[in-house]
C-alpha cells in the first residue's frame, strides 16, 4: 500500500501544534542546523527564523548534501519524540533554493480554497463564487490543418559558404 501524499502546511502551523500527530504533511523551511550524528535537522520558517523552528528526522533520506540557509521542502509524517517534542520523519527532502516563496504560499492558500469548495454540500451555493463563463467556441470552418501557403513557392533559407 502506498503512503499518503501529504497535505501542505506552513511551518508555523506545524510548530504551533495545529497539525495532528501521525499526519502526513508537506512543509518547507531554511536549513538552520544539521546534526548528522543524530540524523536531525532544524528547519526555520523563512519569515521568522527565531520564532518558528521544526525538527526533521533525516535517517530515511540520508546521505544528502546539507547546505545551511538553503530552502528545503520536506514530505513526511509528524511524530512525537521522547520528551514530547514533535518531529517530521522525512520520506522526501528536496533543496528548493531559489523558489518563489510568496508564490508557493499563494498556491497553498488557493489549493485550500479549492478543496474547501469541493467539500461543501451541493445545495449550499450561497458561499460559492459565480463560475467564470465558458470560453467562446471557435467555428469549425476556421480550423485547418493544412499549411496556409499551399501552392506557393517557399524560399529556402540562405546558407553561408
Curated annotation (Swiss-Prot):
InterPro entries referenced in this protein's UniProt entry, alphabetically: NA-bd_OB-fold, Ten1_animal_plant
Gene3D superfamilies reported in the protein's UniProt record: Nucleic acid-binding proteins
Molecular-function annotations in GO: single-stranded DNA binding
UniProt entry tagged with the keyword DNA-binding: yes
DNA-binding region of this protein: 1-120
First-listed, main subcellular location of the protein, grouped into a coarse class: nucleus
UniProt keywords, alphabetically: Chromosome, DNA-binding, Nucleus, Telomere
Spans traversing the lipid bilayer: none
Compartments (UniProt record): Nucleus; Chromosome, Telomere
Record region (Disordered): 119-161
Domain of life where this protein originates: Eukaryota
Polar residues bias (residue ranges): 126-143, 150-161
Gene Ontology cellular-component terms listed: chromosome, telomeric region; CST complex; nucleus
Family: Belongs to the TEN1 family.
Stated role: Component of the CST complex proposed to act as a specialized replication factor promoting DNA replication under conditions of replication stress or natural replication barriers such as the telomere duplex. The CST complex binds single-stranded DNA with high affinity in a sequence-independent manner, while isolated subunits bind DNA with low affinity by themselves. Initially the CST complex has been proposed to protect telomeres from DNA degradation. However, the CST complex has been shown to be involved in several aspects of telomere replication.
Summary of subunit composition and partner proteins: Component of the CST complex, composed of TEN1, CTC1 and STN1; in the complex interacts directly with STN1.
UniProt protein name: CST complex subunit TEN1
Lineage of origin: Eukaryota, Metazoa, Chordata, Craniata, Vertebrata
Amino acid at each position: 500500500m502506498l503512503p499518503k501524499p501529504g497535505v501542505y502546511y506552513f511551518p508555523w502551523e506545524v510548530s504551533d501544534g495545529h497539525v495532528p500527530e501521525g499526519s502526513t504533511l508537506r512543509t518547507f523551511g531554511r536549513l538552520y542546523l544539521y546534526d548528522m550524528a543524530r540524523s536531525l535537522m532544524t528547519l526555520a520558517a523563512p519569515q521568522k527564523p527565531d520564532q518558528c523552528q521544526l525538527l526533521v528526522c533525516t535517517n530515511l533520506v540520508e546521505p544528502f548534501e546539507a547546505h545551511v540557509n538553503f530552502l528545503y521542502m520536506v514530505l513526511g509524517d509528524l511524530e512525537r519524540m521522547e520528551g514530547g517534542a514533535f518531529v517530521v520523519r522525512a520520506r522526501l527532502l528536496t533543496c528548493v533554493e531559489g523558489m518563489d516563496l510568496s508564490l508557493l504560499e499563494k498556491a497553498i492558500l488557493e489549493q485550500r480554497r479549492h478543496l474547501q469548495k469541493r467539500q461543501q454540500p451541493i445545495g449550499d451555493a450561497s458561499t460559492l463564487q459565480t463560475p467564470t463563463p465558458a470560453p467562446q467556441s471557435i467555428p469549425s470552418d476556421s480550423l485547418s490543418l493544412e499549411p496556409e501557403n499551399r501552392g506557393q513557392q517557399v524560399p529556402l533559407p540562405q546558407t553561408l559558404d
